[in-house]
């Protein structure tokens, strides 16, 4: 038993070293592509910096492709178009699993390894997922909201239905609310990839006297928080409303500092892309049978899920996150 533990430790160290250090096996003909939607979002700019950092360390090429706006159909087509480039590997964030699942399978059938990051399609042939435990992220936000509401109040959610990571977060919130019958979900509103729709809907709830009073607004994706905060800023009588956001772009962190956003649940898009490229590179140079199912294989060379973590940011620690963001942009 003692010897087995030592061997396991040495093996684990070897895997970590292979993913965190460059070596002569690489050449600049290798290309790794990240496919996503809403590429203009700050969230994906952070992911791009992680992808670029890993590519620089390994001396390989990287690219981010996908529609600038929220368009799941265009994302699936972009993935298919990328196959002609014969990339060494693909990272994919899934906007709609019914569209992206078949496209991922086409890539794998063509011999291109695929990992999902940020949002998953577990029923596809992707090898594994690197990202947030989105159910747990929802639980984290839900516990915070239940505490701030003292167990009672009306809540509106802003999301894009059918996007797997957002659906998982909503389930996390709902799981928490089961213990608080005084918390009611008034609406789960589809912003259709445009945070301006969240702004308009929030103004509706704050100004329409025929609408039910809403005590809290929850943003399940990264862009709506700033727009909901702006709506509250313009309505002086709404300072008692609670906003729980998602992710840590500058506008969201500033909203927390100014008091218009109570808290945000942050992720690590830099880490997802950084380790995603390195993992794909390892698969490219030490190939396995991509068409084989590894889900129930006790000797699988691949994990099922790599959790990059999530954290709650509020006024008590927002300065730390703002400082980290400023340092990263000044490099």
Region spans (language model):
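Bacterial N-terminal signal peptides that target proteins for export
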Residues: 1-10
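Hydrophobic alpha-helical
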Residues: 89-108, 173, 192-255
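Hinge/cleft segment of the Venus flytrap/periplasmic-binding protein
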Residues: 176-177, 277-331
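Bacterial lipoprotein signal-peptidase II cleavage site
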Residues: 24-30
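Hinge/beta->alpha junction and helix N-cap segments in small-molecule ligand-binding domains
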Residues: 35-49, 64-74, 96, 119, ...
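C-terminal motif of bacterial Sec signal peptides marking the signal peptidase cleavage site
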Residues: 19-22
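Extracellular/periplasmic ligand-binding modules, especially the Venus flytrap/periplasmic-binding
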Residues: 220-229, 257, 267-285
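Flexible loop/hinge segments that line or gate small-molecule binding clefts
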Residues: 98-136, 140, 144-147, 154, ...
